[in-house]
Structures are given as C-alpha cells and as structure tokens.
Amino acid sequence: MDKKLSYTFECCLKELEKRKAESPGDIYDSMYNQISFIRDCVERGLSIDEELAGRSLNFHLLSGRNLAGPGDKELIESISTITEFLMEYSG
C-alpha cells in the first residue's frame, strides 16, 4: 500500500472512531468496520473480493446519506479516495 493510501485509511478510521464515540449507533460502526476490513485486506495482500465471500460493501452509500455538513468534507474526501481505490482494484 502506498503512503498516500495508508494515510487516507488512517485519517478516515481515526475520524470514524471519533464519530462512533460521539454518536453511538450502527452507521459509523458499519462504516468503520468496512473500511478497516478493506485496509486489513490490502495490508495483508488478501483479495478483498474473496474475503467478502459474496457480501457487499456499502460504506460509500452510508456516507452519501449521512455526511453532508461542512465539517464532513475531509471524511468525505477520504471515503472518496478509498472508493476510487476499490474501483481501480476491482477494474
């Protein structure tokens, strides 16, 4: 994993961890768990598709529905970068 992507994962997960503490519930937990899963697969050299075993990722949909405020810009950008990585990875 390159340094930029690693930093993106780190920033995204750190912000989601903060939001989980501030607003407990399923949304931030789900986003955190999915992005952490992707990062772990990439770090270990595992196939994300194989590890998903037919399940799907929806963190990008959750972010689109729940992140719209001015304070969400950096998190949205991080999630967009991770989504772009996944599109290239799968393509």
What are these model-derived regions, one by one?
Residues 54-91:
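Amphipathic alpha-helical binding modules
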Residues 15-62:
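Amphipathic alpha-helical interaction modules
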Residues 8, 34, 78:
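Charged catalytic carboxylate motif
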Residues 1-31, 83-90:
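Short terminal alpha-helical segments
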